[in-house]
A protein has these predicted regions:
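Aromatic- and glycine-rich beta-strand/loop motifs that create alpha-glucan
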Residues: 2-36, 88-89, 253
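Alpha-helical transmembrane segments and their short interhelical loops
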Residues: 101, 107-182, 229-230, 241-242
Length: 254
């Protein structure tokens, strides 16, 4: 690596550490990804336990499906990290520093990814033994598949910010789209038993295929959907990052 490359890397790491630290200093984001998510799993699992032959099956369903919901909502964590008003002023200083604009959005993308991934993994470590939830015979595959999905979600949030230049607009659009896709994908309740038309409609939602991938891993110990989802999420992450390079404009911060 050249001297300039090493200097750019040190600058990036410095900015990344600051962004990563700021996320953990935000009690709302930490609480949403841990306490709120955990309570939602407990409440829905308890209330819907009677719908399953074994009450533990309800906890299995909602632990997996709501972790997926949390991963997708990582896009809003990233948008907050990127364009929250107080942070935006600091971003402006970085843009005109030798670090440049790329460090602004890519550091926040990677910081948001790690923040969400760590908290969601920690939540699984706590809830799985407590609720007798299985992540499959080899939980490493489950955790490994989470990584590109988490990164793609963070990249989506940053990409929307680069396109719409407004945190409020970005958060509203992301919240609406993610919630709609999750409802269609069966996050909160399965739509497969509501007729053939509704069952076909669910296949439109990418969340349906995320659910298939994670449930076949955790319940069937099958890697059938692992690589298709892993590769798709990785490619999507790269495309969204390139989209940020294309749409990011310094003047949007002035």
């Amino acid at each position: 690596m050249t001297e300039k490359g090493e200097l750019d890397m040190r600058r990036f790491i410095t900015i990344f550490k600051m962004d990563f630290s700021n996320l953990f200093k935000n009690p709302v984001l930490v609480g949403y990804n841990t306490a709120f998510a955990g309570l939602l799993i407990l409440i829905l699992g308890y209330l819907c336990g009677g719908d399953y032959a074994d009450s533990n099956t309800a906890y299995q369903y909602y632990t997996v499906s709501l972790i997926i919901y949390g991963m997708l909502n990582g896009a809003m964590t990233a948008s907050n990290c990127f364009m929250e008003r107080d942070i935006k002023r600091a971003n402006l200083r970085i843009i005109y520093s030798p670090a440049g604009g790329f460090s602004v959005y890519f550091s926040k993308m990677t910081a948001s990814f790690l923040f969400n991934y760590i908290l969601h993994s920690l939540l699984l470590v706590i809830l799985c033994p407590l609720l007798h939830v299985s992540l499959g015979s080899n939980p490493v595959f489950f955790l490994l598949l989470m990584a590109p999905v988490e990164f793609a979600s963070a990249a989506l949030g940053i990409f929307f910010c680069c396109v719409f230049h407004c945190e409020e607009t970005t958060s509203t659009l992301l919240s609406t789209v993610i919630s709609l896709l999750c409802v269609l994908g069966g996050t909160f309740f399965s739509l497969d038993g509501m007729g053939s038309l509704m069952a076909f409609t669910t296949k439109i939602s990418p969340v349906k295929w995320l659910n298939e991938a994670f449930f076949t891993l955790s319940c069937d110990n099958s890697l059938q959907y692992f690589w298709p989802v892993f590769i798709t999420a990785t490619v999507l992450s790269v495309l969204l990052t390139l989209g940020c390079v294309l749409f990011f404009r310094t003047e949007d911060y002035i």
